[in-house]
A protein has these predicted regions:
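RNase H-like polynucleotidyl transferase catalytic core
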Residues: 37-48, 123-157, 170-171
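Acidic/histidine-rich, metal-coordinating catalytic segments
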Residues: 97-112, 145, 153
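Short, basic/hydrophobic alpha-helical segments
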Residues: 81-102
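A short acidic (Asp/Glu
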Residues: 23-26, 112-117, 155
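Extended, low-complexity cationic-aromatic segments
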Residues: 1-87
Length: 199
């Protein structure tokens, strides 16, 4: 599928979600002076701190261009937030002249839910209707990875390296500082968060 996508000029993207913690420190190695090991502080959130302990983020890696697109979420990833992320991705790719995105992602419940599958079907039907009228649009071809195989998703190592790169060893970052560091590391603009629907 990836070879076909490349021959056809389609975009290929590996999508996933990740939590960026303000408290948990990543496992990492470092060099230090003899007898003076570098230690990461155990961080705690005070009761007055209103920021969340962790921020959820959707991401898409486009391996051919080495581009990562990020979109943070208010709350956690759920089906309707996933469809909002996919809609945003389509707008981004359409502005670059892309017509098809081969979307490679795992079998998370919010990827394979009835709501997301119906949205994908309706979206692709509306794309075909738009193409018949000469309107540009981006079709999505989802490819689900086998269960229990996150290492097949090429965006996963980027999350690990990103967490190590943005670490703050001695103090607790605010949610805004954390988001800015993540976006700076990946070279992405800070954009509005995807918000869950309020019933």
């Amino acid at each position: 599928m990836i070879a076909l996508a490349r021959r056809s000029g389609w975009a290929v993207g590996y999508a996933d979600e990740v939590w960026w913690s303000r408290v948990a420190q990543p496992k990492m190695h470092s060099w230090s002076e003899a007898g003076e090991p570098l230690r990461l502080q155990e961080l705690r959130v005070s009761k007055e701190d209103r920021d969340p302990k962790a921020l959820s983020c959707y991401g898409l890696l486009e391996p051919d261009s080495k581009t990562i697109r990020l979109r943070f979420v208010d709350g956690r990833p759920v089906s309707h937030v996933t469809t909002a992320f996919l809609e945003w991705l389509c707008q981004q790719l359409q502005s670059q002249g892309q017509g098809v995105l081969v979307l490679i992602w795992d079998n998370a419940s919010w990827h394979v839910s009835k709501e997301v599958r119906q949205w994908l079907q309706q979206h692709n039907q509306s794309v075909l209707a738009a193409e018949r009228e000469g309107q540009p649009a981006v079709r999505l071809i989802p490819c689900w990875l086998p269960t229990k195989s996150p290492w097949l998703n090429r965006i996963e190592p980027h999350w690990v390296h990103g967490k190590r790169a943005i670490v703050e060893p001695a103090r607790l970052l605010t949610a805004q500082e954390l988001e800015k560091r993540v976006c700076d590391y990946f070279g992405c603009p800070v954009v509005d968060h995807l918000a869950p629907k309020v019933s």
